[in-house]
């Protein structure tokens, strides 16, 4: 990748120009190059670059891109410390101090490096941190498949893998990207093992609460399979999740009556919980029954007779349930409902359906052969 340079001169002259520029901005730095070589010059230049990050003139962008371009031409073994130092400077700049420039500089550095260099991890983490402070997460790559590939390419340790995923999750949350954040959190929790699951206790707790809060999250059984979530078994938060996964509204109401303070401490809205549990309960009813009377719905979902039809219309809008209202007979005719859990029983049902299709297709094929032979 070609990175913009400060001036088209030799690396040594470029370093000298940068020194002079920084000194003119008030930095405590010598105008003379170091005898130790370019990497020593860059270390001193990066240490003094704070002064120009506060300015708003065009020379700032040129000078900082020049620093980036010089870092990129160094041998890999000399880059790492400089990259860490530069990233630290760009991240620590106060909020509001040219975040778009800092993002651009980090992006130039990130994309200018060889794709397999582990030091890209440091730059990517810095990108996430800066993007989070200015709501600029949309300007950096966050696709989970790509992040997985980078984690593999950089051969990250388990700890560093957790760091980058946690940073990405928090940045997505801060930038109101709840759907993407939820996927990243599941990826993070899924990377823990039985040996270290206890370390993710707080992350698992956050994941459950955010899933319960999300008005569009209805299928939560996959969370129970995550090892850090399993580690919470026996705690109220795990009991609450289990209710949202497979229990009825009545179970939630009983839980709330016994643990109101706990629900409030999580920042959950009881009214929103009731609304979600009504839909989840209705989904379960629709799986087991092709026809459901208004009276049954009213009783199971604890609502007034005048609320039933509006509820059904809202339920259909979620696309979790497909049904029609029979106003004459005061009932609902179900055509399809999404299973709240997908376990062994559901796999067996799917197998039976596919096997039936296979047998029917074979019958059709044999019939066509018989006709053609005749």
From Swiss-Prot:
Residues 180-339 form the PCI domain. It is found in: Cytoplasm. The lineage of its organism: Eukaryota, Metazoa, Chordata, Craniata, Vertebrata. Keywords: Cytoplasm, Initiation factor, Protein biosynthesis. GO terms for molecular function: translation initiation factor activity. Belongs to the eIF-3 subunit M family. InterPro entries: ARM-type_fold (IPR016024), COPS7/eIF3m (IPR045237), eIF3m (IPR027528), eIF3m_C_helix (IPR040750), PCI_dom (IPR000717), WH_DNA-bd_sf (IPR036390). It comes from the Eukaryota. It comes from Xenopus laevis (African clawed frog). It holds the Pfam family eIF3m_C_helix. GO terms for biological process: cytoplasmic translational initiation; formation of cytoplasmic translation initiation complex. Component of the eukaryotic translation initiation factor 3 (eIF-3) complex, which is composed of 13 subunits: eif3a, eif3b, eif3c, eif3d, eif3e, eif3f, eif3g, eif3h, eif3i, eif3j, eif3k, eif3l and eif3m. One of its GO terms (cellular component) is eukaryotic 48S preinitiation complex. This is Eukaryotic translation initiation factor 3 subunit M. The keyword Cytoplasm applies. Component of the eukaryotic translation initiation factor 3 (eIF-3) complex, which is involved in protein synthesis of a specialized repertoire of mRNAs and, together with other initiation factors, stimulates binding of mRNA and methionyl-tRNAi to the 40S ribosome. The eIF-3 complex specifically targets and initiates translation of a subset of mRNAs involved in cell proliferation.
